[in-house]
Amino acid sequence: MPGKLRVHELAKQLGITSKELLATLKDKGEFVKTASSTIEPPVVKRMQEHYGSSGSDKSDTAAKPAAAKPAAPKPAASAAPKPGAPAKPAAPAAKPAPAAPSAASAAKPGAAPKPGVQAKPAAAAKPGAPAKPAAPAAPSAAKSGSAPKPAAAAKPAFSGPTPGDAAKKAEPAAKPGAEAPRPGGMPRPMGKPAPKPGARAPRVANNPFSTGGGERPAPRPGGGPRPGGGPRPGGGPRPQGQGRPGGQRDGQRDGQRDGQGNRGGQRQGAGAGGPRPQGGPRPQGGSRPQGGSAQGAQGAPSQERQGGGRRPSPAMMPPTPGQMPAKAPGKGGRGGQAGGGAGGGFNRGGGTGGGAGRGGRRGGTAGAFGRPGGAPRRGRKSKRQKRNEYESMQAPNVIGGVRLPDGKGATIRLARGASLADFADKIGADAAALVQALFNLGEMVTATASVSDETLQLLGEEMNYKVQVVSPEDEDRELLESFDLQFGEDEGGEADLAKRPPVVTVMGHVDHGKTRLLDTIRKANVGSDEAGGITQGIGAYQVKVNVEDTERTITFLDTPGHEAFTAMRARGAKSTDIAVLVVAADDGVMPQTVEAINHAKAADVPIVVAVNKIDKPEASPEKIRGQLTEYGLIPEEYGGDTIFVDISAKQGLNIDELLASVCLTADAELDLVANPEMDAQGVAIEAHLDRGRGPVATVIVQRGTLRVGDSIVAGDTYGRVRRMVDEYGRDVEEAGPSRPVQVQGLNGVPGAGDNLLVVEDDRIARQIANQRNARKRNALAARSRKRVSLEDLDSVLKEHSTLNLILKGDNAGSVEALEEALLKIEMDDEVQLNIIDRGVGAVTQTNVTLAAASDAVIIAFNVRAEGKATEEANAEGVDVRYYTIIYRAIEEVEAALKGMLKPIYEERVIGHAEIRAIFKASSVGLIAGCMVEDGKVRRNATVRIIRDGNVIAENAKIVSLRREKDDATEVSAGYECGMVLSYPDISVDDKIEVYEMVEVPREA
């Protein structure tokens, strides 16, 4: 079978444009998308008929007959071809003789014979013609469109001649394609020629595999034998849509269904219908077997075909309107007692006489192209159709012309710094629609940019969604759960748990003696090494002390007391078991003391108060107890539960008593146990970049045992433990619970306070670190992004004074503390502080290059520039500031910000004068003769002219000033002068107020 034609190919054959052909197809009910779409052969044939194409064009889509091998004889029921399917012709057979024409062939086109009436042949029937019925009747032609009268079906006398007889009596037929001679010498009817087949009703579907192309052949009226008509116009094959040839299958099925005798009727004779394709002698010289009656169909098999091949399908034959039953107007459905007139829709159905006619049925593939045929009926709607109709009934959620989905109160969980693309994936919407909707709400963002939490929640409320931004803790927990990891829980049962030393954090105000206390306990001197005598980092030590003749191990954390190290104190409180609050007896409760109390209470950590410096004469321990009572720390001697110990760190007084109190609190209030056999988990309390060792993290192991060679992940850094050292610089191979160690081997400097976790291999550690890093960047981008509305766009584009800084420090905690302290500086909106980069380690050339490009200042805290960074900074003019004490860096940055502020000016009145007379001069105009009443009048000063208490001129200038005939710079009170003003509209008795704008220094 040749390939299917496309729309543009058929249009080229027909000599029209593709657009015209598409329009015609649409009018005919064939819905084809584009000019490149393929068309089924029946539709091609219809279009060719519609546009009057030549026969050569039609031959492209017709099924070509091909020779087939002779098949074994089969029963007639199985030999009948399927309706609508092209049948291959048999091998060359005997040319059939034409059958005798009946009266029906001479009837008008569209006329249908009455049921039960068989036309009498004009001459003796040739072999192969249909047999004469038992009760012949005169032919009567019905008008086109009239319904035939019901009558009982007449049974034929016999089924027809045998194939052998038909072969003997057959006459030579004309060549294929030529017109066959009319039997009996009957002349051709002289009526009007058969009309050319025109356009038919739209097909049900463009499907070549449907039964009969979506149509059902009409039954023959009366069930009698088919009239032996002459050759059809053009001598073509059987027209499409004619009655099904009789046979066992048709007779049996239709006879049983309708209760009629011979629904299928006799099969057309061998000679009827013109010559066979590739006309040759039929094998064994037989004609086609005739269709039997209902009894024969049900009781005995029909005669077998001897030809072995199938005849052409009705779907392959052109229509013959002259022999087609007329269509009755009206709707389809089952016919009545009147023989079931022609069916509606696309079928030409009709029942047999005396029975209920079968109406038109739907096409084989209903709904493929256009509405199905037959009578319209209400079917069940699909779920999708119902859902679409329901959603269309709902009020659309439209924001600024953009249709968005309605959340109906659903909850959406998004990570920090999520983008609109992430939001769109969650709700199944288009990211571009969300961008446009947010633009209409006054926010300008892209689909992939990180969006702040407030913006996500605002957009969610507009779409009726509840947006929950996942907290950092939940986000990290979900990340670890995706790798089947957990942090913060001991593995195993209680039998696997063992006691661990307490972790004690020393907290308090600056210069109250925290580091001196630890020095006394460790019998070392650490405070002398600190810059400025203050602690600027967390120190972790593990010492062994004798408490009540028992050696106990205690881990101490020394936190800074300066106000800039709030985050460090909070981190120390979270990593500890017991907090020792150091308060100087001669100083009292200070702001950082109160802050330390709040941190300890927030972490639910028991507090032991150490009242220090009791050796000083002005010390008042009782005063300290009274002050701390206001903050909920009630001494035991006052009936409370807080232990107070009076000590002197400098002289070493009562240190043992303090350690005993710490151990007593740990034993009484805390159950300090951990599993030492599990994979290690801990916290990085400090981290820095060492010149020779690389990134170094100070870690406290909270549970498990950390060993050299373990794969670890700390925050957004990962690596393998290459070396561990204790607080004395000695190498250790493993570290158990509550043990502080310095870990080397990470790929970067972790953040202070990041959790440390041992994982199975480096691959998992790298994946966790990379995902944490990506989330951290998104959150930072969302937080640092400024919300710019359309109304504020003009003001944002104006130039602002911005101080760009690059922070470098010796460890992560110092950089964090410095950044937080700088961001807390309160300044006006006209000056902004922007920290563009931060890092741990020396100042590098990369930092200098970035500073030069962004006009930034580098703040180096406890680090210096390395290599050629200093030379490059001098060449580029980059300002690098070095500091060793954090509060000095804060003070200088604050002063620099204040210096960038625009000056504040204040108006100051310097004198008043009154116009007494006005003179005119051609060269200068009006001259005001004035008397200075108070103050001074200066040349080029700014004046305000007042008339009758109303200001008539503002910001006028004294252009010229004279005293007598001499020019004067200023004139004092009590003197007359003449002046020329820049404002010409002056009059006598006007008051002149002279003032100047003076810069006022800003308050510190």
Curated annotation (Swiss-Prot):
Stretches the record annotates as G5: 648-650
InterPro entries (alphabetical): EF-G-like_DII, IF2_II, IF2_N, P-loop_NTPase, Small_GTP-bd, T_Tr_GTP-bd_dom, TF_IF2_bacterial-like, TIF_IF2
Keywords recorded for this protein, A-Z: Cytoplasm, GTP-binding, Initiation factor, Nucleotide-binding, Protein biosynthesis
Region feature (Disordered): 36-393
tr-type G domain sequence ranges: 499-671
Amino-acid positions noted as binding GTP in the UniProt annotation, renumbered to this chain: 508-515, 558-562, 612-615
CDD domains on file: IF2_eIF5B (cd01887), IF2_mtIF2_II (cd03702), mtIF2_IVc (cd03692)
Sequence segments annotated as region (G3): 558-561
A GO cellular component annotation in the UniProt record: cytosol
Positions of the UniProt region annotated as G4: 612-615
Annotated region described as G2, given as residue ranges: 533-537
Amino acid composition bias (Basic residues), ranges on this chain: 377-386
Subcellular location, record wording: Cytoplasm
GO MF, one annotated term: GTPase activity
Gly residues bias spans: 237-249, 261-277, 330-373
Bias (Pro residues) ranges: 184-196, 219-236
Gene3D superfamilies the UniProt entry points to: 1.10.10.2480, P-loop containing nucleotide triphosphate hydrolases, Translation factors, Translation initiation factor IF- 2, domain 3
UniProt key word Nucleotide-binding: yes
Biological function: One of the essential components for the initiation of protein synthesis. Protects formylmethionyl-tRNA from spontaneous hydrolysis and promotes its binding to the 30S ribosomal subunits. Also involved in the hydrolysis of GTP during the formation of the 70S ribosomal complex.
Family: Belongs to the TRAFAC class translation factor GTPase superfamily. Classic translation factor GTPase family. IF-2 subfamily.
Protein name: Translation initiation factor IF-2
Source organism of this protein record: Corynebacterium glutamicum (strain ATCC 13032 / DSM 20300 / JCM 1318 / BCRC 11384 / CCUG 27702 / LMG 3730 / NBRC 12168 / NCIMB 10025 / NRRL B-2784 / 534)
